[in-house]
């Protein structure tokens, strides 16, 4: 490698947490995924906060929260402001994931980490790409190109290929799946041969995966036994990723008459179920060849489900007849409708709970997977209830004070606007106050008259101030006021009101009432719940198994391998296997959390800063696509560089934690003090944190002219004799090969010695010097 390649792990190494890594390619820094775990760990945010000012671009691989969950917080709260790249489905389905996650949390707790506006602001920054679309970066990223390739795990899931100057090839491939499924094709990593660096995960490195046919039979058997026993089936799934595979599978089973499931109900329950299905209908071209052919030949959209009912709340689900199979989010059972249904159904032995996803350790779903024999567990019951009594009165009083304060602020703003427009108002003659009719078109002031010297027998206008409301308009006409077009809400019938008050439908389950416009509070209590329902884990994660991962890496033959996201024993197993396959041809790294891996293969590559005075004195020679120059200078290690572009003298960085730091006497001039203040204003008063993030880059200064040593000329870009022959012929010099020697005008011989150098022989004549000059022109001489 001729580039500096470094990877800093912010989260998701030696564990199964969210994925977030900082990749440095020379001066450009990529953030590979921006995930957040189910518990919204602060450690991930703290790690991200230290590097957020360095990030130049974000690459998102999958739409689920483990890959992009922290993006709204990073954009809304940390100030992340850079280009974000993702495929079109990751953009659309990622929004669905985050909307559903926010609403699931908000329904039962006071969730304030991010809002729906933060989600929209973050996704507005995403540049949407198609598979195999090459994007050439600009600015600091000049010479870099990124290409998204299909990963086969979720719709739009991406393997990122990063290429530097057409030579260095970096592949970021996590959570990929090489097997073809109902709704997705598998990935084809074998096409990426001999990348310079491969970054992959070890999540499934030691996992033995049952065959797909066996898993489908297990699912069908479980569903049939439960439904025929008059029980309900809860399948915990994600919002808009792997749920599409299960929805396709179950809808196909329901269509099969032999299965006998047509009499039972099938439902999809999450906060955005309708939008997920609608987006899926418009993204068939991103799916498997089988679904594409079905859509093209039969003109039948595969996501036009016949048996799957779409539900947005427990009230919708209550209208679906029992027994039923429900696909509910979230897969971790930490929040959402899946948790609500689990609490309701787990104490009935007739029911069945099917888990399809190994979530992060510490979640309820992972606890049930790892401890299948546990029948009693403590669960925190959270819900949102209406305010009543004294709490409601206090809330109303607070809201009243807020409205009064807002009204006063609005009045003060209007007063400022009126005073600024007073000069404009005085120029216009007041119209009658009774004339307030609005027109469909912009009308000139009707009835307005200009005052004149002569008395007019017309109706006089009021003499007291009667300002008319100024109609605001832009280049499109009058500005529309939304309140003028609001439709009055239809009054609910007495029957509907009674249903809402009772909160029951068909005598089954309590309806979830819309509490968005009602003052509420969140309450929680921890209870011990006995699990009597059957709990089963069936793998529908859509990842490659351990043996396949090892074979794929062996076929790719990467020069360097960085293993992330997986338990330590799985990472160790994958590393040993790859070393056994590749031997000395592969370097394997298993970084720890917050560790920086230097994947630069060339050990003698360093970054230096050149003074302007030195650059202006250089004499460049062109060699192919590059320009070369000889430099005589001296290194100065006193200057520290921070990626914001603000430079500090080394002596000004006071870090008490580093006792061994070299003490350098820095000039205490006013400019240095100003620079230090600028750094504090950018990063706050935490000087220790600043010192940790400061990277020392030496500065190369020019030598005084009398100290510059001489050097022998260096000849670079050595030509081939056949090419030099063509140059001589173009200049009118006869040249031909005789025994491997190029003879020119029968007077000068050009030969290549055993050491590979080119020698010139012949009598000292005009042709000799002319041929020598032409030969020199073929070199870059510095």
From Swiss-Prot:
* GO terms of biological process kind: mRNA 3'-end processing by stem-loop binding and cleavage
Record-linked CDD domains:
CPSF2-like_MBL-fold (cd16293)
Provide a Gene Ontology MF annotation, just one: RNA binding
Give a Gene Ontology cellular component term annotated to this protein. Answer: mRNA cleavage and polyadenylation specificity factor complex
* SUPFAM superfamilies noted in UniProt: Metallo-hydrolase/oxidoreductase
Stored Gene3D superfamilies: Ribonuclease Z/Hydroxyacylglutathione hydrolase-like
Biased segments, Basic and acidic residues type? 407-416, 439-449
Q: Where Phosphoserine occurs along the chain?
A: 419-420, 423, 660
Q: List locations, semicolon-separated.
A: Nucleus
Query: What family does this belong to?
Result: Belongs to the metallo-beta-lactamase superfamily. RNA-metabolizing metallo-beta-lactamase-like family. CPSF2/YSH1 subfamily.
What binding partners and quaternary form does the record give?
Component of the cleavage and polyadenylation specificity factor (CPSF) complex, composed of CPSF1, CPSF2, CPSF3, CPSF4 and FIP1L1. Interacts with CPSF3, CSTF2 and SYMPK. Interacts with ZC3H3.
Q: Protein name, please? A: Cleavage and polyadenylation specificity factor subunit 2
Q: Which organism is it from?
A: Mus musculus (Mouse)
Q: Which gene encodes it?
A: Cpsf2
């Amino acid at each position: 490698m001729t580039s500096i390649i470094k990877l800093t792990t912010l989260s998701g190494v030696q564990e199964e947490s969210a994925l977030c890594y900082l990749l440095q390619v020379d001066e450009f820094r990529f953030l590979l995924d921006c995930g957040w775990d189910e518990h919204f760990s602060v450690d991930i945010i703290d790690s991200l906060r230290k590097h957020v000012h360095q990030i130049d671009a974000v690459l998102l691989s999958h739409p689920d929260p483990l890959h992009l969950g922290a993006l709204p917080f990073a954009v809304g709260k940390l100030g992340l402001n850079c280009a974000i790249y993702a495929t079109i489905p990751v953009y659309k389905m990622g929004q669905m994931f985050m909307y559903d996650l926010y609403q699931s949390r908000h329904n039962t707790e006071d969730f304030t980490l991010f809002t729906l506006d933060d989600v929209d602001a973050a996704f507005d920054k995403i540049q949407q790409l198609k598979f195999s679309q090459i994007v050439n970066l600009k600015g600091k990223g000049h010479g870099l190109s990124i290409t998204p390739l299909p990963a086969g795990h979720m719709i739009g899931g991406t393997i990122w290929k990063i290429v530097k100057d057409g030579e260095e090839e970096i592949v970021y491939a996590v959570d990929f799946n090489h097997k073809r499924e109902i709704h997705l094709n598998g990935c084809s990593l074998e096409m990426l041969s001999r990348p310079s660096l491969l970054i992959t995960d070890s999540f499934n490195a030691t996992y033995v995966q049952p065959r797909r046919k066996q898993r489908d039979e297990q699912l069908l058997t479980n569903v049939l036994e439960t439904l025929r026993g008059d029980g309900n089936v809860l399948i915990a799934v994600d919002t808009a990723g792997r749920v599409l595979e299960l929805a396709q599978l179950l809808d196909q089973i329901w269509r099969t008459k032999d299965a006998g499931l047509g009499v039972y109900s099938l439902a999809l329950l999450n906060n955005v179920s309708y939008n997920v299905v609608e987006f899926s209908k418009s993204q068939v071209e991103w799916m498997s060849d089988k679904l594409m052919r079905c859509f093209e030949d039969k003109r039948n959209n595969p996501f036009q489900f016949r048996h799957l009912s779409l539900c947005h709340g427990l009230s919708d689900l209550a209208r679906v007849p029992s027994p039923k199979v429900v696909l509910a989010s979230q897969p971790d059972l930490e929040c959402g409708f899946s948790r609500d249904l689990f609490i309701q159904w787990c104490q009935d032995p007739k029911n069945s709970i099917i888990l399809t996803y190994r979530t992060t350790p510490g979640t309820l779903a992972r606890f049930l997977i790892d401890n299948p024999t546990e029948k009693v567990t403590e669960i925190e019951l959270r819900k949102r209830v209406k305010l009543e009594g004294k709490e409601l009165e206090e809330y109303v009083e607070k809201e009243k004070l807020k409205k009064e304060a807002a009204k006063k602020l609005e009045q003060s703003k209007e007063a400022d606007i009126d005073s600024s427009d007073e000069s404009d108002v005085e120029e216009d003659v007041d119209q009658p106050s009774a004339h307030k009719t609005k027109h469909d078109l912009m009308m000139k002031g009707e009835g307005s008259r200009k005052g004149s010297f002569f008395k007019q027998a017309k109706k006089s206008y009021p003499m007291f101030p009667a300002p008319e409301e100024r109609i605001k308009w832009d280049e499109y006409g009058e500005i529309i006021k939304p309140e003028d077009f609001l439709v009055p809400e239809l009054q609910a019938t007495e029957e509907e009101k009674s249903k809402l008050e009772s909160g029951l439908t068909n005598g089954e389950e309590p309806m979830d009432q819309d509490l968005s416009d009602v003052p509420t509070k969140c309450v929680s209590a921890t209870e011990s719940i006995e699990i009597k329902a059957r709990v089963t884990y069936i793998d529908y994660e859509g990842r490659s198994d351990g043996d396949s991962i090892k074979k794929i890496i062996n076929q790719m033959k990467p020069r360097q391998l960085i293993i992330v996201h997986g338990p330590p024993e799985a990472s160790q197993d994958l590393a040993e296997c790859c070393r056994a396959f590749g031997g000395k041809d592969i370097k394997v790294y298993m970084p720890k959390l917050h560790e920086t891996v230097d994947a630069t293969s060339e050990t003698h590559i360093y970054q230096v800063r050149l003074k302007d005075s030195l650059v202006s004195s250089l004499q460049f020679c062109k060699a192919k696509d590059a320009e070369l120059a000889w430099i005589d200078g001296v290194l100065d290690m006193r200057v520290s560089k921070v990626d914001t572009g603000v430079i500090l003298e080394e002596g000004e960085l006071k870090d008490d934690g580093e006792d061994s730091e070299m003490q350098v006497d820095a000039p205490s001039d006013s400019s240095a003090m100003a620079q230090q203040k600028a750094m504090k204003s950018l990063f706050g008063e935490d000087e220790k944190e600043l010192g940790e993030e400061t990277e020392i880059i030496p500065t190369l200064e020019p030598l005084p002219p009398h100290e510059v040593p001489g050097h022998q000329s260096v000849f670079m870009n050595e030509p081939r004799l056949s090419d030099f022959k063509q140059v001589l012929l173009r200049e009118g010099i006869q040249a031909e090969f005789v025994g491997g020697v190029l003879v020119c005008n029968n007077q000068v011989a050009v030969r290549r010695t055993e050491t590979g150098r080119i020698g010139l022989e012949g009598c000292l004549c005009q042709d000799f010097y002319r041929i020598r000059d032409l030969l020199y022109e073929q070199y870059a001489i510095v």
